[in-house]
Amino acid sequence: FKLYPLTYTELEQYPQDLDFDSVFRTYHLKRKKIDQERLYELLWTGFYPRVYDKHLDSYKWYENYIFTYVERDVRSLLNVRNLRTFEHFLILCASRSAQLIDYSDLSNALGVSLPTIKEWISLLETSGLIFILPAYFENFSKRIVKTPKIYFSDTGLLCHLLSIRTVKQLKVHPLLGSIFETFIVGECFKRFY
């Protein structure tokens, strides 16, 4: 099994409901007013427990996390000749969070083969950095062939990869809507996977 970053309800210590419908209930929100500033701060800081347990500077922590991930994990799991290209791939994926995956576009932008891009996406998914949300259609065949969306499992990591260095920058960032969508979909995903 995979351990994803904390959910908003875990971090804010709300009671945990295990059924899907509970995600859409608002009774637990009445107990505590959601502070918009706190929400921006959480989106920027992300939800990895270590940042909160150790009271770490989240931006530096994500920098080290990415370096360790790329240097250790990627190097050992894949035969990546140019780690810098993989880092650019991570950044391009971040810029496409909450969007349809366009493998060809990633391939062309990086000058890397399509099978390599698919292998790298699979690695990100297997390691829990991203998750893929299949298209939903009542027709099962359409679900299989339609393009899925890519989401990062943590908004702090996403913000770091997008070079968002402060909460103030997050508030005016052109991808704020995608970051917020990543947060909402991620909350649903992390509760049930």
Question: What are these language model-derived features?
Answer:
Residues 8-11, 157-158:
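A generic structural signal for short hydrophobic patches within well-formed alpha-helices
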Residues 14-23, 68-69:
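Conserved AAA+ ATPase "sensor/coupling" helix adjacent to the nucleotide-binding pocket
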Residues 11, 46, 89:
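A residue-level signal for conserved active-site and pocket-lining positions in enzyme catalytic cores
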Residues 52-193:
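Accessory nucleic acid-recognition modules appended to NTPase machines
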Residues 1-9:
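A short helix-turn-beta junction within AAA+ P-loop NTPase domains corresponding to the substrate/partner-engaging
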Residues 28-65:
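Amphipathic alpha-helical "lid/sensor" segments that cap RecA-like P-loop NTPase cores
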